[in-house]
Amino acid sequence: MAGAKEIRSKIASVQNTQKITKAMEMVAASKMRKSQDRMAASRPYADTMRKVIGHLANGNLEYKHPYLEERDVKRVGYLVVSTDRGLCGGLNINLFKKLLADMKAWSDKGVQCDLAMIGSKGVSFFSSVGGNVVAQVTGMGDNPSLSELIGPVKVMLQAYDEGRLDKLYIVSNKFINTMSQVPTITQLLPLPASEDDELKRKTWDYLYEPDPKALLDTLLRRYVESQVYQGVVENLASEQAARMVSMKAATDNGGSLIKELQLVYNKARQASITQELTEIVGGASAV
């Protein structure tokens, strides 16, 4: 019965692992709902900022802010939003693959790339594959605040202000639903014109009080910050959804493995009983 004992031990081990993955699935489901609430709460502000900025990009401005002007592209920057923890399926690696493809496209044109990392998984990945990481922040937890994210954002905006960057993108996962999270690369600077057909058909003229430069300086920075924060909370909701799905798959796979091991155990036990009966019958016949 040595084989049967070993199989029983494996079954017990898988059952213990199954309890852990089930608990992690339930925790991820709870955190996902909270993340979705935060995402829904911040989305109206981010969407409204995007519309206001879209009006500005299509407008006839008396003061042309540097964030609204296209430049010859020599260096681009990416604000990369990844997770701090693993066990969330291919969420991070799919994002990194898309980013690497975009970086290669720029590199083929002779354009250099800078990276500002949000999340430890991005830091560790680009430490191994290589990349010019100029800023990073990790360990933000499940309820990040804008003050925790502002470091990398300031670094990239300063580089853009000083002419060391000519384009700035945010790279994150867009939350569609529990089963779908899409890696996206969105241009932040220079400010892209709105894709809204209604805005394209209109000409917008603005009067600024008291000073257009001061107003636009503040407004455009708030726009970048709002888009980065929205990207982070959507990525967090995507992380919890991906982890919940991964842990459910692990729990289900554990159940299938237990059934297979139970079948092997039953066969081994049956073979052992048959062997014992054969030995008893053989001994009786000898007597």
UniProtKB/Swiss-Prot annotation:
Keywords: ATP synthesis, Cell inner membrane, Cell membrane, CF(1), Hydrogen ion transport, Ion transport, Membrane, Transport. One of its GO terms (molecular function) is ATP binding. The keyword Isomerase does not apply. It comes from the Bacteria. GO terms for biological process: proton motive force-driven plasma membrane ATP synthesis. It is found in: Cell inner membrane. It is a peripheral membrane protein. Its main location: membrane. F-type ATPases have 2 components, CF(1) - the catalytic core - and CF(0) - the membrane proton channel. CF(1) has five subunits: alpha(3), beta(3), gamma(1), delta(1), epsilon(1). CF(0) has three main subunits: a, b and c. PANTHER family: ATP SYNTHASE GAMMA CHAIN, ATP SYNTHASE SUBUNIT GAMMA, MITOCHONDRIAL. This is ATP synthase gamma chain.
